[in-house]
Amino acid sequence: MSTSASQSTWPAAGPVAEALLDVSTWLIAGASVIFVGVMVLLVLAVQGGPRAVRARLWVLGGGVLFPSVVLSVLFVYSERHQPPWRVAPPKDALIVGVTARMWWWEVRYRDPATGQEIVTANEVHIPTGRPVYFGLSSDDVIHSFWVPALGGKMDAVPGRVQHLQLQADRPGVWRGQCAEYCGAQHARMALHVVAHAPAEFDTWLAAQARPAAPARNGALDRGREAFLAHRCNACHTVRGVSEESRLGPDLTHVGSRLYLGAGTVPNDDARRVAWLSHIQQLKPGARMPSSAERLDPATLQAVADWLGSLQ
């Protein structure tokens, strides 16, 4: 599986992105030709010295006819190649709900076997080779969902559901970003799209539908008990352990995610401890207090280890 940490439109990873890239390429090529032409005329005008010209002919040709033809051609081309961003999904479509919040993403699926809602955060997993339909909304301010390698961006607006269609043609991991300024940590409101082969996606979705695995040993169980004792579950759901709140990201399978804090830091043992201890240094303004002043190092390590075990 290929991995890219960049937010580039090139190379395109799906048909929607390819259509946008084609239009952009033609626009850039056309603009380059016009720029070169203008520079050539400017040089000729400077070197040629004063001479009589038919001003009206230049105005009509260069100021009216030429831009009208260029804009008309580009308009027709772009309209014919406009990707189907807002196509109504068929009955058997994979629909992914994405709710933007300051400053993270809640992601929701439906288990095709049971109809159960499956909730995760900050990572969108999709199968390759088929369109995926996104329902985008926001719980606070206007955000914008954008994964450049897969397609165009779409605003997530409070009180509305916006629809976007994307598709990945090959397995891989692509970074996305909130593309609408939404507050202090806008720059750290990223997401990752993980595209699997269809069979692998079905396996992933089935695993996500299961509740959190029981603690495998006493040390992990101490982490689970500390998580509950210090009321982390007042904001975070861990299915099978506590389902009181969805104020913060669902942590049922947080150990399987690539990053913490909506792409802020990689999800490994050391950074999980650092995230719990000093979140306000890593993501100032996040709606979660740093825990270093409330919990001793051993307790922080136990909670971090337990969260890491939630695969």
Predicted regions and their residues:
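Generic alpha-helix structural propensity
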Residues: 28, 38-41, 64, 77
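Short, solvent-exposed mixed-charge patches
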Residues: 1-3, 310-311
